[in-house]
Regions:
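N-terminal intrinsically disordered/low-complexity leader segments
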Residues: 1-15
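Amphipathic alpha-helical linker/stalk segments
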Residues: 8, 66-96
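Helix-turn-helix
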Residues: 19, 23-65
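Solvent-exposed, amphipathic alpha-helical segments
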Residues: 19, 23-30, 77-81, 113, ...
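Amphipathic alpha-helical segments that line or abut small-molecule/effector binding pockets
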Residues: 22, 68, 90-108, 112-116, ...
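Short coil/turn segments at alpha/beta junctions that flank glycine-rich nucleotide-binding fingerprints
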Residues: 30-34, 85, 107, 152
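Short helix-capping/turn signature of helix-turn-helix
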Residues: 56, 116-123
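Amphipathic alpha-helical packing segments from all-alpha helical-bundle domains
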Residues: 72-75, 80, 106-115, 125-152
Length: 153
């Protein structure tokens, strides 16, 4: 497993949290959900186990926040793509589909982390809650674009 570059000692709380979330994504990609440990996350981030516990009081909280981070990243990605596509429904649909394949959100590590979470979603309703509202927004946007395409004939 790759260890991230050794970070400076003093970083903001948000930067440290993001660093730990990125390390969690890396660990999930290699080890999977059940075999990922906080120690591996700390090692991958180049931080102490204590810092992981300081920022995330449990593995469940760290994983939940990692899923929320991935979900927000994905949502911002497709929303930006649709907004940049302009007013044409055909261009918006094209942008929406292409957004799923952009390197920022479809790296092997990120896809593996998503798969790890999908495998746990049935037994962890919290994960469904974390992504459910964002998924509903995606579906609503897709339906609106398709309705606009149909209206154009």
């Amino acid at each position: 497993m790759t260890t991230l570059a050794k970070p400076p000692r003093k970083l903001s709380r948000e930067v440290r949290r993001e660093q730990l979330i990125e390390a969690t994504i890396s660990v999930l990609a290699v080890r999977g959900y059940a075999r990922a440990t906080l120690t591996e996350v700390a090692d991958t981030a180049g931080l102490s186990h204590g810092l992981v516990n300081f920022h995330f009081t449990s593995k469940d909280i760290l994983f939940s926040e990692t899923l929320a981070y991935l979900s927000e990243e994905y949502t911002q990605n497709w929303q930006r793509a649709v907004a940049l596509a302009g007013p044409s429904p055909a261009a918006q649909l094209d942008a929406l589909v292409r957004a799923d394949f952009l390197a920022e959100v479809s790296t092997p590590q990120r896809l593996a982390a998503w798969c790890a979470f999908w495998g746990e979603a049935q037994s962890r309703p919290l994960y469904q809650e974390k992504c459910g509202s964002k998924n509903a927004i995606y579906i609503e946007t897709l339906e609106q674009i398709c309705a606009a395409l149909l209206a154009e004939g």
